[in-house]
From Swiss-Prot:
Protein name: NAD kinase 2
Entry-linked HAMAP family: NAD_kinase
Gene Ontology biological-process entries: NAD metabolic process; NADP biosynthetic process
Keyword Disulfide bond applies: no
Catalyzed reactions: NAD(+) + ATP = ADP + NADP(+) + H(+)
Source lineage: Bacteria, Bacillati, Cyanobacteriota, Cyanophyceae, Synechococcales
Any Pfam family matching the protein: NAD_kinase
Family per record: Belongs to the NAD kinase family.
Any one GO molecular-function label of the UniProt entry: ATP binding
Gene Ontology cellular component list: cytoplasm
Length: 302
């Protein structure tokens, strides 16, 4: 019986392309039909940020052949490739094995040094699934949905370039609206709490927490601090700035947002399914990849 697997590759990186060739051969020898696609299919909007419309919504990012018959997809690239691949697989409920051929690889499960072992475990089914929550980001004008994307990490909204103050009115569920003056705002998932939001002063959140966090970028008030709230509450961001803003989703999707637009952020029904070949303790991952909680090697003498 022929089984089906996907291969999502960062075609802009020679190392990822060469690795994909060997991985595809190995899968085909194990009687897999392999559907290979470029990770660029999950990048939405940046080629022409004025062109908002995704007529079929975020599910339009799912490549042809990626369906319920696919056992898994292997992602070859860095963290940006993984974020793009999430949009290509989550709506189809396809689990992904992330193999790092980039730099940090915070979202990577395996590396080139243990590639053969990882593929062997994958083929024999020696793996589990960890589900990560995602968001749906929509740009609305009146009742028209002008742009939409799935988001695994964060949505950032700011001026272009990021040089001057913006004003936002933000509505969270039934709570009173929040007014923020800052260089921009970030709405992130727990997965995204270790990315842009962390650099902007937001807290680290463990991946299993059902929350969203709002983090101002360089706020112009001591009262503006990161806010964490339940992910069941929809968020609407109203730009109160006369110039257009730039919205960036997961670092590789985005569009312009005009004063007459609003940005709607809501919990997605589609989680991103990560294949885990071994148990990962989250604090240990923080320690290994971000240096969190490391002991002081040398302390000053008294």
């Amino acid at each position: 019986m022929v089984r089906k697997a996907g291969l999502i590759v960062n075609d802009g990186k020679e190392l990822a392309v060469q690795t994909a060739i060997s991985v595809q051969k190995k899968l085909e020898k194990s009687n897999y039909e392999v559907v290979r696609v470029s990770s660029s299919g999950g990048m939405v909007g940046f080629a022409n940020p004025d062109q908002h419309v995704r007529p079929l919504g975020y599910s339009n990012c799912v490549p042809e052949g990626f369906d319920s018959s696919m056992e898994f997809a292997i992602v070859l690239g860095g963290d940006g490739t993984v974020l793009s691949a999430a949009r290509q697989t989550a709506p189809a409920k396809i689990p992904i094995l992330t193999i790092n051929t980039g730099h940090l690889g915070f979202l990577a499960e395996a590396y080139l040094s243990n590639l053969e072992e990882a593929i062997d475990k994958l083929i024999i089914g020696k793996w589990d699934i960890e589900e990560r929550k995602s968001l749906i980001i929509s740009v609305m004008r009146n009742e028209q949905r002008r742009w939409e994307s799935l988001c695994l990490n964060e949505m950032a909204l700011h001026r272009e370039p990021l040089t001057s103050m913006c004003h936002f009115e933000i509505s969270i569920g039934r709570h009173a609206p929040v007014d923020i003056s800052a260089d921009g705002v970030i709405l992130s998932t727990p997965t995204g709490s270790t990315a842009y939001s962390l650099s902007a002063g937001g807290p680290v959140i463990t991946p299993d927490c059902p929350v969203v966090q709002l983090t101002p970028i360089a706020p112009h008030s001591l009262a503006s601090r990161a806010l964490v709230f339940n992910d069941s509450e929809p968020v609407t961001v109203f730009p109160a700035t006369p110039e257009r803003l730039v919205m960036v989703v997961d670092g590789n999707a985005g569009c312009y947002v005009w004063p007459e637009d609003r940005v709607l952020i809501r919990k997605s029904k589609h989680s991103v399914k990560f294949i885990r070949l071994e148990d990962h303790e989250f604090f240990q991952v923080l320690r290994n990849k971000l240096g969190w909680g490391l002991p002081h090697v040398g302390k000053p003498n008294k």
